[in-house]
């Protein structure tokens, strides 16, 4: 997702993070509640850390690092996702063992945990000390669409940002690809994330919907 699309998707949160980056105050642990642009924001922030040709705090989106991060292949940005509907304790313990190490290509490391509410309780507990006392330049982004299912101890130790669904933004974007308003409203109603909306836009265009 391009930066202007992310700003349109979540203008308040985008501007807040621009200010945070400009002040050099990026926290080491965030909880992103809601999946409308949350993954895209985590990737944007990762690019801002690793981009080799930034314009101020803004990543270029074109350098090797930016492209690898977008493709989820950059070695210092680790993506964690559920397997069989659970994020196992063993996977998080492997993660914790990396926290005391420097990055491969930089001093930073970024960990993005998708559907973080699906972490086993022991897995979540194993992260508490690391969140409280990070031993290296690490940044952890917990992404969840069900904040209430996250352990209270995780919620209390992270900065929480809301990524609520922006129906009006979705409708506008769907209309931009040629959908009439009532069809745009219908697709916007059933799309649960910005990524899903983008896929729907492409499908709708190909099918002549």
At which residue positions do the language-model features occur?
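Short loop/turn elements that form and flank the Walker-type P-loop nucleotide-binding site
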Residues: 25-26, 70-74, 104-107, 134-137
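Active-site catalytic microenvironments for nucleophilic, acid-base chemistry
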Residues: 48, 52, 130-133
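Conserved beta-strand positions
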Residues: 79-80, 113, 163
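Structural motif
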Residues: 110-112, 141
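ATP/adenylate-binding site constellation spanning eukaryotic-like Ser/Thr protein kinases
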Residues: 74, 92, 124, 147, ...
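Charged, glycine-rich active-site and insertion segments that engage polyanionic ligands
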Residues: 1-48, 56, 65-68, 136-139, ...
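AAA+/P-loop NTPase substrate/partner-engagement loops
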Residues: 59-88
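Conserved alpha-helical scaffold flanking the Walker A/P-loop in AAA+ ATPase domains
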Residues: 15-21, 89-110, 117-118, 122-130
